[in-house]
Amino acid sequence: MGMTIAEKIFAAHLVDEPFHGTRVLKLDVVMCHEITTPIAIADLIARGKDRVFDTSRIKAVIDHVTPSKDSKTATQAKMLRDWARRHNIKDFFDIGANGVCHALFPEKGFIRPGYTVIMGDSHTCTHGAFGAFAAGVGTTDLEVGILKGVCAFREPKTIRINLNGKLPKGVYAKDAILHVIGRLGVNGATDRVIEFRGAVVDAMTMESRMTLCNMAIEAGGTSGICMPDSVTVDYLWPFISEDYASKEAALVEFKKWWSDEDAVYERVLDLDISGLEPVVTFGYKPDQVKTITEMAGTPVDQVYLGSCTNGRLEDLRVAAEILKGKKIAPTVRAILSPATPKVYSDALHEGLIDIFMEAGFCVTNPTCGACLGMSNGVLAEGEVCASTTNRNFMGRMGKGGMVHLMSPATSAATAIEGKMADPRKYL
């Protein structure tokens, strides 16, 4: 019987099987940020186990509230900073070098096909775009990962999603994943790996694949995952060129992780994306989705462009194409948070930041801030935000606030009109 990519990764990293259905895996990368990691650090210190299993395999960043907004967040940042210095963790990104973790770490080439990756953050599934098994974990698992370099997981069952056809004009990876979540439901992939396949995925950039995998958790998925291919090789080549004689040789190695033709899936869902319209959410769950045609005209107070879902250069380019030479509506405020310093710098050099500022956007430093209602764009009670983030839970971006999830293109069109708008008219 053949194996899925997730099963192959599990088999290659298996350390122990303490009881049926549970696998203890060796970890390739443990990622840390200043919100969840300090809790693990404090407990390790209290237990007299302030150690790390391998400093080269730990990556840490201050990203959620940066710069710190108050004493509490400053203390959290200091705990992570002091810990990283104490253990000589070289891949630690402090103020000035920091960015949103799930954009920054791939940008640094830290994730490779076949890797096992954990973090105390639910959107760690983003890194599955590289053909890795990447999952968010709780504090106890994070502690064990930091200390021992292992983590326990349930035996993986995989749901395969075949995205067939071709993305229409004005429709992007964000629309595709919202459509998938709408079909699966918020619990439809609980404790499952979602394997994204098909012509649509094959044609996507790594940035778009990261958008897909980023929101696997919104359907309950432990991880999202894509097959590593020539697109993956091209993205990683600056970091792996010394390890392989050629890109072709790297691709041969990467293909060893591909799911076998006779792999067994718990479920296979075929979706033709060719006729898909831009998609937006309408309620307080990510599976509550409608087309922009159904939602057009809904007024908003704020537009937010950024996050680990859609704060990459590709996303900024899409939005800037629509915004160029235009102004945002006087009834809205618009905020752009580039996901990393490199994204910010590249956008500056391409003239994209000028386009956003001339349109009326406020441009912030790289941060998660507004996405989870912590800083740099928090909503007031009763306000509505058109957002490129990944969660629309009640109060997610501010107590009593309403969030509608959408693509960067739809958010840009919405900013221009001050109400939900179809981006296709501007393309």
Curated annotation (Swiss-Prot):
CDD domains: IPMI (cd01583). The keyword Ion transport does not apply. Belongs to the aconitase/IPM isomerase family. LeuC type 2 subfamily. InterPro entries: Acnase/IPM_dHydase_lsu_aba_1/3 (IPR015931), Acoase/IPM_deHydtase_lsu_aba (IPR001030), Aconitase_4Fe-4S_BS (IPR018136), Aconitase_4Fe-4S_dom (IPR036008), HAcnase/IPMdehydase_lsu_prok (IPR011826), Homoacnase/IPMdehydase_lsu (IPR006251), IPM_dehydratase_rel_enz (IPR050067), IPMI_cat (IPR033941). GO terms for biological process: L-leucine biosynthetic process. It comes from Geotalea uraniireducens (strain Rf4) (Geobacter uraniireducens). Keywords: 4Fe-4S, Amino-acid biosynthesis, Branched-chain amino acid biosynthesis, Iron, Iron-sulfur, Leucine biosynthesis, Lyase, Metal-binding. This is 3-isopropylmalate dehydratase large subunit. Pathway: Amino-acid biosynthesis; L-leucine biosynthesis; L-leucine from 3-methyl-2-oxobutanoate: step 2/4. Catalyzes the isomerization between 2-isopropylmalate and 3-isopropylmalate, via the formation of 2-isopropylmaleate. Its cofactor is [4Fe-4S] cluster. Binds 1 [4Fe-4S] cluster per subunit. [4Fe-4S] cluster binds at C308, C368, C371. GO terms for molecular function: 3-isopropylmalate dehydratase activity; 4 iron, 4 sulfur cluster binding; metal ion binding. It is an enzyme of class 4 (lyase). Pfam families: Aconitase (PF00330). It catalyses: (2R,3S)-3-isopropylmalate = (2S)-2-isopropylmalate. Its EC number is 4.2.1.33. Heterodimer of LeuC and LeuD. The gene is leuC. PANTHER family: 3-ISOPROPYLMALATE DEHYDRATASE LARGE SUBUNIT 2 (PTHR43822:SF16), HOMOACONITASE, MITOCHONDRIAL-RELATED (PTHR43822).
